[in-house]
């Protein structure tokens, strides 16, 4: 009845009742949360990447859960487990490396995944062609008459790009 509805609405207002987010997630199977895992929060490119992700997720009414691994493989695996427990609807993994352990943990999560920064055969990915770009730069230098080009860039041990850029 209308009277009952008004009484319920009054009690809701007076008690400042808010429905449980957990219960809603259980009912709808959707949390409206996206996990974002970054390897190093203070790297050159991560703030720009996060800005773009945040802007797009705001447009879609998703909350971004951000975690930083500080370049620790063990921490990354733990963070992926945390995201799974948090019932994220999807994951964006800004990866400096993508190992079999990562792939196993991602598979176990059972949510859509996008990999940024590494090539993947299993998951949609966005990455730089570091080797191709370095090769194109070298060709341009040689065409312009440079005979002893030097490589000055990230260390070859840099897992994300070093060896690929050096090969190029």
Describe these PLM feature segments.
Residues 66-73:
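Short beta->alpha junction loops
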Residues 1-32:
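N-terminal helix-turn-helix DNA-binding module of bacterial transcription factors
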Residues 88-94, 150-153:
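Periplasmic-binding protein-like
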Residues 97-110:
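Active-site-adjacent beta->alpha loops and helix N-cap segments on the catalytic face
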Residues 26-42, 140, 148-156:
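Short beta-strand segments enriched in small/hydrophobic residues
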Residues 74-87:
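Short, well-structured alpha-helical segments in soluble
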Residues 10-15, 52-63, 84, 108-115, ...:
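Bacterial carbohydrate/catabolite-sensing allosteric modules
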Residues 38-55:
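N-terminal winged-helix
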């Amino acid at each position: 009845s209308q009277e009952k509805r008004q009484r319920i609405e009054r009690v809701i207002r007076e008690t400042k009742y808010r429905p449980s987010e957990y219960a809603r997630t259980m009912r709808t199977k959707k949390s409206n949360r996206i996990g974002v895992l970054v390897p190093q929060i203070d790297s050159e490119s991560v703030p720009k990447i996060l800005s773009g992700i945040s802007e797009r997720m705001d447009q879609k009414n998703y909350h971004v859960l951000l975690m930083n691994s500080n370049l620790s493989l063990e921490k990354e695996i733990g963070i992926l487990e945390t995201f799974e427990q948090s019932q994220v609807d999807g994951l964006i993994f800004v990866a400096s490396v993508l190992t079999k352990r990562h792939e196993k943990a991602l598979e176990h999560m059972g949510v859509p995944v996008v990999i940024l920064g590494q090539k993947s055969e299993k998951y949609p990915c966005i990455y730089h062609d570091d080797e191709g770009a370095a090769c194109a730069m070298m060709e341009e230098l040689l065409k312009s008459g440079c005979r002893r080009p030097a490589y000055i860039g990230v260390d070859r041990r840099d897992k994300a790009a070093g060896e690929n850029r050096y090969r190029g």
